[in-house]
């Protein structure tokens, strides 16, 4: 990890020297100074800005072939000359930066917090908070109404260096991100075997045993897989079930108590009880034999064949298809009778969607073009796609009377694939207040939100989750170093205990090892930034 960090720093140092060396020379990747003031759209005379971007291989090589950008050019009078990379973006972006021939801005920049702080320190990008106040009324309005986003955008040095992507789909406990590893159960098998939906962890064991031994698919073969998952930090892990035994677990192994204390989840006794429960399933032969080895493709292949009794994923349509054979597994009561759901720390926010470089000579024009992306109707299209495209399937239809967008039926088309062909991405904001006024909510999101509200929200006790705080480079390096070793150790030991047992005899040594990796320092840093975020968002 230290070697990788050093290498990245070296590349960025080279980049900064190249940028400085390029000062005073002709920069063909950026635009000339148009000397514009008091910019209003559309411009009387078309001007060109030069941006670098990343896009999906499914989308056109020239982003200007997208109808969204064609309309935007007409509305603003600004032509964008794109350098568009559809693969290996970070590597190509860094090479361009190191050449010193910078564009006016980098769109969909994909920058880590370390990148942003390095670029700022070396003079590759500029702070933008003054531009927001002076030239960007759409974004400023959002930040005034939602100060928590401004707190998340602000770097430890007090500056804002990048423009965010914001996608609200539900708020607080009712956010679409509150649960990722949703558990799904084969209700056709329940019906075939005359079983009721399980209500407790003990019930689940009995149901899974029946799935194993009762030939619920009726083919006369013992080919059913009672319980399957993909182990790790995805949306297909079983850790969701651990909440039946206490505070539960999530991908970060981090929850925020209602007293504001940041708690680690993978070192307490109820985590141990959760592991022991999954160990029971292993001992009874109920777990997919390939569960700790298979990849996404083999997982969905089994899902499409409907071999699973219980499995985990964000949306069942991705694994077992759009049928009624599977339903949500309700929150299960544990041995104490407790029902609990541990929230994830996911949220619809990313601060790395656009930066303005230090060679940009048209700051007002650039800022106002970016601000146009934060207009509600524009943000919705940039995020999901557009309407009125004669060349391909549309995401929306435009209601001209209300000037709002309505999602069209997908008719079997994969939503992610269609969106990648038409969306623009980049800096945007979609607030919950837009639904029903500016746009309808995507059907798949509405369906999932309804499930979360019905099945999970009543059992969420934690008011807050851990936000995407902006740390100093020093603390980022510390966290990255600790997480790299500690998280690998946590998942390795969990798998060993499930397959081989011995958690009780090894538990104390496990906790000592977590301390050696730096758990106490890790929690102290996390707590410090959580407290700062709470103070700054108000």
From Swiss-Prot:
Gene Ontology cellular component terms for the protein in this record: plasma membrane
Lipidated residue numbers (N-palmitoyl cysteine): 23
Binding site for Ca(2+) 1: 215, 217, 219, 221, 223-224
Keyword line: Calcium, Cell membrane, Lipoprotein, Membrane, Metal-binding, Palmitate, Polysaccharide transport, Signal, Sugar transport, Transport
Lipidated sites in chain (S-diacylglycerol cysteine): 23
Assembly notes: The complex is composed of two ATP-binding proteins (MsmK), two transmembrane proteins (FusB and FusC) and a solute-binding protein (FusA).
Record annotation: effect of changing residue 314 to A: Loss of fructooligosaccharide (FOS) binding. No growth on nystose
Signal sequence, renumbered to the chain: 1-22
Function field: Part of the ABC transporter complex FusABC-MsmK involved in short- and long-chain fructooligosaccharide (FOS) import. Required for the utilization of long-chain FOSs. Binds kestose, nystose, fructofuranosyl-nystose and inulin, but not sucrose. Has a preference for long-chain FOSs (tetrasaccharides and larger).
Subcellular location: Cell membrane
Any one GO biological process: polysaccharide transport
Lineage start: Bacteria, Bacillati, Bacillota, Bacilli, Lactobacillales
CDD domains listed in its UniProt record: PBP2_AlgQ_like_2 (cd13581)
Gene Ontology MF term list: metal ion binding
Protein name: Fructooligosaccharide ABC transporter substrate-binding protein FusA
Organism field: Streptococcus pneumoniae serotype 4 (strain ATCC BAA-334 / TIGR4)
Membrane protein topology class: Lipid-anchor
């Amino acid at each position: 990890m230290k070697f990788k960090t050093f290498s990245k720093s070296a590349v960025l140092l080279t980049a900064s020297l190249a940028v400085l060396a390029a000062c005073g020379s002709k920069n063909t990747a950026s635009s000339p100074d148009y000397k514009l003031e008091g910019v209003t759209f559309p411009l009387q005379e078309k001007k060109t800005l030069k941006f670098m971007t990343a896009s999906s291989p499914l989308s056109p090589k020239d982003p200007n072939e997208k109808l969204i950008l064609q309309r935007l050019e007409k509305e603003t009078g600004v032509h964008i000359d794109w350098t568009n990379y559809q693969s290996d973006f970070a590597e190509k972006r860094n090479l361009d930066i190191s050449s010193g021939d910078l564009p006016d801005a980098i769109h969909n920049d994909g920058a880590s917090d370390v990148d942003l702080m390095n670029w700022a320190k070396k003079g590759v990008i500029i702070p933008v908070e003054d531009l927001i106040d002076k030239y960007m009324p759409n974004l400023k309005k959002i930040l005034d109404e939602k100060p928590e986003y401004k707190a998340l955008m602000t770097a430890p040095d007090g500056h804002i260096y990048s423009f965010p992507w914001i996608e609200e789909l539900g708020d607080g406990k009712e956010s679409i991100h509150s649960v990722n590893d949703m558990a799904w159960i084969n209700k056709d098998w329940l019906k075939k075997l005359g079983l009721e939906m399980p209500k407790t962890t003990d019930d689940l064991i009995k149901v899974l045993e029946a799935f194993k031994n009762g030939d619920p698919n009726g083919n006369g073969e013992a080919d059913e897989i009672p319980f399957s998952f993909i182990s790790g930090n995805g949306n297909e892990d079983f850790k969701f079930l651990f909440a039946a035994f206490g505070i539960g677990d999530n991908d970060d192994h981090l929850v925020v108590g209602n007293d504001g204390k940041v708690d680690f989840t993978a070192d307490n006794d109820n985590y141990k009880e959760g592991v022991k429960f999954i160990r029971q399933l292993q001992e009874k032969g109920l777990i997919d034999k390939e569960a700790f080895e298979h990849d996404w493709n083999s997982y969905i292949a089994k899902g499409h064949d409907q071999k699973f009794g219980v499995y985990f994923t964000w949306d069942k349509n991705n694994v077992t298809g759009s049928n009624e054979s599977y339903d949500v597994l309700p929150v299960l009561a544990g041995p104490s009778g407790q029902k609990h759901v541990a929230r994830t720390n996911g949220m619809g926010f990313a601060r790395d969607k656009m930066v303005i470089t230090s060679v940009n000579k048209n700051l007002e024009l650039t800022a106002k073009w970016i601000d146009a992306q934060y207009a509600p109707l524009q943000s919705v299209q940039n995020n999901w796609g557009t309407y009125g495209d004669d060349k391909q399937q549309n995401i929306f239809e435009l209601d001209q009377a209300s000037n709002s967008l309505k999602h069209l039926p997908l008719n079997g088309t994969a939503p992610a694939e269609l969106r990648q062909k038409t969306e623009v991405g980049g800096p945007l904001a979609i607030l919950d207040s837009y639904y029903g006024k500016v746009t309808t909510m995507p059907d798949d999101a509405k369906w999932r939100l309804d499930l979360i509200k019905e099945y999970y929200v009543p059992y969420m006790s934690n008011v807050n989750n851990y936000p995407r705080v902006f740390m100093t480079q020093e603390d980022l390096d510390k966290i990255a170093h600790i997480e790299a070793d500690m998280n690998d150790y946590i998942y390795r030991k969990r798998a060993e205990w499930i397959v081989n047992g011995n958690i009780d005899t090894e538990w104390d040594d496990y906790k000592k090892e977590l301390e050696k990796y730096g758990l106490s320092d890790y929690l102290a840093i996390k707590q410090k930034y959580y407290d700062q975020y709470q103070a700054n968002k108000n």
